[in-house]
UniProtKB/Swiss-Prot annotation:
Biological source species: Bos taurus
UniProt keyword list: Cell membrane, G-protein coupled receptor, Glycoprotein, Membrane, Receptor, Transducer, Transmembrane, Transmembrane helix
Protein name: G-protein coupled receptor 171
Gene Ontology BP, a term: regulation of sensory perception of pain
Gene Ontology molecular-function annotations: G protein-coupled peptide receptor activity; G protein-coupled purinergic nucleotide receptor activity; neuropeptide binding; neuropeptide receptor activity
Amino acid sequence: MTNSSTFCPVYRDLEPFTYFFYLVFLIGIIGSCFATWAFIQKNTNHRCVSIYLINLLTADFLLTLALPVKITVDLGVAPWKLRIFHCQVTACLIYINMYLSIIFLAFVSIDRCLQLTYSCKIYRIQEPGFAKMISAVVWLMVLLIMVPNMIIPIKDIKEKPNVGCMEFKSEFGRNWHLLTNFISIAIFFNFSAIILISNCLVIRQLYRNKDNENYPNVKRALISILLVTTGYIICFVPYHIVRIPYTLSQTEVISDCSTRISLFKAKEATLLLAVSNLCFDPILYYHLSKAFRLKITETFASHKESKAQKEKPRSENNA
């Protein structure tokens, strides 16, 4: 290990980020719990988009498990064993969630594209059985890529402050980590292309139908497509712009201390944007899942009715 990597204080001053991660965790866990309740309460009819959204929700729960540990470690109050656990397990869960989210958003976009542009045909990819099978394949693929980072033996290093996860890794662990990063970047670029192409095709089709008498449904569909695209770009694009140079700084291809510190801070800031998909996903469920939308409507409608019934006797008594 070089002197620059030994003495460069890369992994410090993380406390300001932790407050934002904590806010994301609070909003995200409330939204995810409500989404779970809504999907359980309402029959989703096992439509493809519902299957993909349920898988997306499952991935979000992995993130809610990981964030409290990351927050504790970044605050500098975690015991040594918890810091090791974070590097081996919970940090990997964050990336498992990220790439599952990217892939399932791509399948949601494909499903919407086929529904709105080729509505007269039913393709194999739109069958619920195929959606379940491809979801299982996606989970298996992502876990096969990421889980070795959890189980490859780590080095036994002396306890010290501001230690980075790469310092725990053996040479084989570092090489696998590097391979994982570039596979992940390839996943991002390929599925980003799918999302953008699918959504552009849908927007073009909807624009052609803008004068149709069914305009309210067209407008709702357009909003949902723009929501997916905008949320995806905000959450995931900045992180992957930073990830390639940050990976090079981890392997000491980039060794300048100030550059490494800047890249690490940029990585943390863009990772914050990436995990904020936890807050964005419940909005996505509302626009894309009829079952979720109906449950929310029923819940607020019943709340208003009960409130009106409570206020009615008061008004009668005052009269």
